[in-house]
Design a protein with these regions (language model features):
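C-terminal cap/loop subdomain of S1 sulfatases and analogous C-terminal strand-loop tails that border
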Residues: 1-17, 28-111, 141-147, 151
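Short glycine- and hydrophobic/aromatic-rich loop-to-beta-strand nucleating segment
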Residues: 21-24
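Active-site-proximal N-terminal segment of extracellular/periplasmic enzymes that hydrolyze or transfer
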Residues: 118-126
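Substrate-binding clefts and catalytic carboxylate motifs of secreted carbohydrate-active enzymes
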Residues: 129
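Basic, alpha-helical interaction scaffolds
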Residues: 133
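Type III/flagellar export substrates
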Residues: 137-139
Length: 152
């Protein structure tokens, strides 16, 4: 059950991607602090923990340090998050979620529409175009799937 969010497990809609995160660190993280705006990915754990432990993170990893989010500091920008899966490739950048796939092109402002009910693709073609370009460039970087062997 994903509550107000669209989708569920194994889907790229918000309901399939959002995971609650609780951190307890007395004197560092405010006890009642809630942040439902910022997002981070599993690849961000290592560089963030390294930063908090004053350890240099490896240079050749995909994640970025997001420990400032955990500590309640306002963040200027987070790199876009990209996914490949059902219903097609997706990107989340700041307040925007863009999908391209089975349902055509979808664009949502998840800051005002976390349930992803109102497709804004026609109202914000310039936003959709920029996100589309990022998704297409990223997809070209991904390795091609290995073809299945022919049955004999």
């Amino acid at each position: 059950y994903a509550g107000q969010f669209r989708g569920g497990k194994h889907k790229l809609f918000e309901g399939g991607l959002r995971v609650p995160f609780i951190i307890r660190w007395p004197d560092k993280v405010k006890a009642d602090y809630v942040d439902s705006v910022n997002v981070f990915s599993g690849v961000d754990w290592l560089p963030s923990i390294c930063k908090l432990a004053s350890i240099e993170a490896p240079k050749d990893i995909d994640g970025e340090d997001v420990s400032d989010m955990w500590l309640g500091t306002k963040r200027a920008h987070h790199k876009p998050l990209l996914w490949k899966g059902y219903p097609g490739p997706s990107i989340r950048e700041k307040k925007w979620r863009y999908y391209k796939g089975k349902y055509g092109e979808l664009l949502y402002d998840v800051s005002t529409d976390p349930g992803e009910k109102e497709n804004l693709i026609k109202q914000y073609p310039e936003v959709a175009g920029g996100l589309r370009k990022q998704v297409e460039a990223w997809m070209k970087e991904l390795p091609r799937p290995v073809p299945k062997p022919k049955k004999r």
